[in-house]
């Protein structure tokens, strides 16, 4: 059963302005080490890479129904890739706690994430699916 759906649209140019204005302070506060390493390897699409991940964090916060309140912080939501290359979320801290609280007894949650960009927009969708154990 679906227990949460979230989507977000992020302006890549807005992320570029944050990178220009706040630099390392912005990326360290918002993104995980894995996310930063991936974005920094992509010199030509650095801002778009960050924007997609920013949108994924926002989409997850909507899927769990809290936004960035109730102990859910951006850095607790990390985008990583499965061996197949498909994106997924790695959750820690308040983000993991909130998802655990939403998970019905006797179920596990699969997090489905898709991201895309077409300048100047980056978009992400998150579906939280509870499956019986």
Curated annotation (Swiss-Prot):
What Gene Ontology biological process does one annotation of this record name? fatty acid biosynthetic process
What EC class is this? transferase
The UniProt entry, under Pfam families, shows: ACPS
The UniProt entry's GO CC annotations, sorted and at most eight, read: cytoplasm
Q: Which cofactor does it need?
A: Mg(2+)
For this UniProt record, the keywords arranged alphabetically read as follows: Cytoplasm, Fatty acid biosynthesis, Fatty acid metabolism, Lipid biosynthesis, Lipid metabolism, Magnesium, Metal-binding, Transferase
EC no.? 2.7.8.7
User: What is this enzyme's catalytic activity, as reactions?
Assistant: apo-[ACP] + CoA = holo-[ACP] + adenosine 3',5'-bisphosphate + H(+)
- Answer whether the UniProt record assigns the keyword Calcium to this protein: no
UniProt lists the family membership as follows: Belongs to the P-Pant transferase superfamily. AcpS family.
- The protein's name is Holo-[acyl-carrier-protein] synthase
What organism, scientifically named, is this protein from? Rhizorhabdus wittichii (strain DSM 6014 / CCUG 31198 / JCM 15750 / NBRC 105917 / EY 4224 / RW1) (Sphingomonas wittichii)
Question: Gene symbol?
Answer: acpS
């Amino acid at each position: 059963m679906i227990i949460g759906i979230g989507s977000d649209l992020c302006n890549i140019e807005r992320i570029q302005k944050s990178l220009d204005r706040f630099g390392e302070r912005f990326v360290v506060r918002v993104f995980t080490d894995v996310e930063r390493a991936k974005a920094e390897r992509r010199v030509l699409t650095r801002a778009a890479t960050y924007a997609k991940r920013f949108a994924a964090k926002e989409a997850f916060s909507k899927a769990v129904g809290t936004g960035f309140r109730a102990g859910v912080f951006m850095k607790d939501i990390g985008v990583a890739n499965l061996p197949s290359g498909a994106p997924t979320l790695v959750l820690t801290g308040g983000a993991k706690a909130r998802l655990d609280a939403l998970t019905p007894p006797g179920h596990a949650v699969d997090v489905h994430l898709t991201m895309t960009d077409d300048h100047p927009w980056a978009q992400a969708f998150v579906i939280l699916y509870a499956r019986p154990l």
